C-alpha cells in the first residue's frame, strides 16, 4: 500500500523533513526586513517578514519638521494595528471554515 517494506516509515520521514524545512523557512522570512516606498521614495516603511514595522521614514518636504517624528510613529502604529486586525479576521474566518476546530499554534493560512 505504501510502496513495500519501509514505505510508511519513509513517508513519515519525508513528512518530518518537509515540516522542518517549512519551519526553517518561516523563521527566515520572519527575520527578513523589507522596505516599501511610495511617492518616489518620499515615504518609506520597513517591516519584518512577520509584518512588524521596524522603521518609517518621511521626507521633510512633506510636512513641518517639528511634526515629523510624531507622524512617523503614528504611521507605524496604524500599520501595526491593521496587521493585527488582519490576523484576527483570518482566525475568525478560519474558525468558520474549520467548524470551530482549533488550529495548531503557528498555523498560517496559505494566502
Swiss-Prot record:
Q: List the disulfide bonds.
A: none
Keyword Cytoplasm part of the UniProt annotation: yes
GO terms for CC? Answer: bacterial nucleoid; cytosol
Region: Disordered; residue ranges are 1-23
Q: Which GO terms describe its molecular function?
A: DNA binding
List the residue ranges forming a coiled coil, or say none. none
Q: Name one Pfam family in it.
A: YbaB_DNA_bd
**Key word DNA-binding present in the record?**
yes
Task: Show the Gene3D superfamilies listed in the entry.
Answer: Nucleoid-associated protein YbaB-like domain
The subcellular localization recorded is:
Cytoplasm, Nucleoid
The family database entries (NCBIfam families) matched by this protein are listed as: DNA_YbaB_EbfC
Which function does this protein serve?
Binds to DNA and alters its conformation. May be involved in regulation of gene expression, nucleoid organization and DNA protection.
Q: What is the protein's quaternary organization?
A: Homodimer.
Family per record: Belongs to the YbaB/EbfC family.
Q: What is this protein called?
A: Nucleoid-associated protein VSAL_I1086
Amino acid at each position: 500500500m505504501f510502496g513495500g517494506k519501509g514505505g510508511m516509515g519513509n513517508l513519515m520521514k519525508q513528512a518530518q523533513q518537509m515540516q522542518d524545512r517549512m519551519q526553517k523557512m518561516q523563521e527566515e522570512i520572519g527575520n527578513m526586513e523589507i522596505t516599501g516606498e511610495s511617492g518616489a521614495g518620499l515615504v518609506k516603511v520597513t517591516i519584518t517578514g512577520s509584518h512588524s514595522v521596524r522603521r518609517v521614514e518621511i521626507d521633510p518636504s512633506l510636512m513641518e519638521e517639528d511634526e515629523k517624528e510624531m507622524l512617523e510613529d503614528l504611521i507605524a502604529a496604524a500599520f501595526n494595528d491593521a496587521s493585527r486586525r488582519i490576523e484576527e479576521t483570518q482566525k475568525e474566518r478560519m474558525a468558520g471554515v474549520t467548524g470551530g476546530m482549533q488550529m495548531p499554534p503557528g498555523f498560517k493560512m496559505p494566502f
